[in-house]
Amino acid sequence: MSHDDLMLALALADRADELTRVRFGALDLRIDTKPDLTPVTDADRAVESDVRQTLGRDRPGDGVLGEEFGGSTTFTGRQWIVDPIDGTKNFVRGVPVWASLIALLEDGVPSVGVVSAPALQRRWWAARGRGAFASVDGARPHRLSVSSVAELHSASLSFSSLSGWARPGLRERFIGLTDTVWRVRAYGDFLSYCLVAEGAVDIAAEPQVSVWDLAALDIVVREAGGRLTSLDGVAGPHGGSAVATNGLLHDEVLTRLNAG
């Protein structure tokens, strides 16, 4: 990973913002249904195609894995991970909580991540060993740091929906966790994890996620001083589920979600 990789990721996000802004709320937005019954729009495809074209020119030796057009899942060497619009359901309904997620993995470990949410006028990014940062409406970036909350009864928790927690026993444990913490909100998708990195939320959890949902978020959370694992406690974005915390609460959250 070099400084140029971060600059490239930020430039890719700039272009993604241009493409998504003009399609958000467009009356002629094309919406299709994928085999997994989730929506995909012409904006999703346009962003991922543009990212792939740029990487093919500027990083021809790097791999690319994206939500819409796939790619290798061996996770060796240098590989860019792209979720062109995280929060497509929000996008199609006119809800401004959506973002383009772009990450660089080196041998499966995120080294650069950018989360860009133009409808919120916010962006978060991080590079390995260089910290995590955010900017609001293009203002001067500020460095991110997770909270120092050390007790669950004082903690704020965010998630996306209850439907994924339906596995027998898991929903009960999750609801038990929500009953224990101080505050629960469903900020959802990328925003839960970015708020953990900002120190505004202490816990984010999702039972079903893909690597493109997490790769950029993983390094943003970690570089802000937090911790991100699967529900099984495996570090990184590959576990198919996610728990992100300020680090101080992590082990207790995992214990509660895996009890029984």
Swiss-Prot record:
**Inducing or repressing factors:** When comparing gene expression levels of the four IMPase family genes in exponential cultures of M.tuberculosis, the level of cysQ is the highest, almost equal to sigA; impA and impC are expressed at approximately 40% of this level, while suhB is lowest, at 12% of the cysQ level.
* Alphabetized InterPro entries for the sequence: His_9_proposed (IPR011809), Inositol_monoP_metal-BS (IPR020583), Inositol_monophosphatase-like (IPR000760)
User: What family is it from?
Assistant: Belongs to the inositol monophosphatase superfamily.
What keywords are annotated for this sequence in UniProt?
Amino-acid biosynthesis, Histidine biosynthesis, Hydrolase, Magnesium, Metal-binding
What does this gene product do? Catalyzes the dephosphorylation of histidinol-phosphate to histidinol, the direct precursor of histidine.
Positions annotated to bind substrate? 67, 85-88, 185, 213
- Explain what the UniProt record notes about the effect of disrupting the gene for this protein: Strains lacking this gene appear to be not viable, even in the presence of high levels of exogenous inositol.
Report one GO cellular component: plasma membrane
Q: Which reaction does it catalyse?
A: L-histidinol phosphate + H2O = L-histidinol + phosphate
Q: What is its EC number?
A: 3.1.3.15
From the Swiss-Prot or TrEMBL record, give the protein name: Histidinol-phosphatase
| Parts forming coiled coils | none
**Pathway given in the UniProt record:** Amino-acid biosynthesis; L-histidine biosynthesis; L-histidine from 5-phospho-alpha-D-ribose 1-diphosphate: step 8/9
Organism encoding this protein: Mycobacterium tuberculosis (strain ATCC 25618 / H37Rv)
Indicate which residues the UniProt annotation says bind Mg(2+) 2.
Answer: 83, 86, 213
What is the recorded phenotype of mutating residue 86 to N?
Causes a probable loss of enzymatic activity
Q: Name one GO biological process term.
A: mycothiol biosynthetic process
Q: Which residues bind Mg(2+) 1?
A: 67, 83, 85
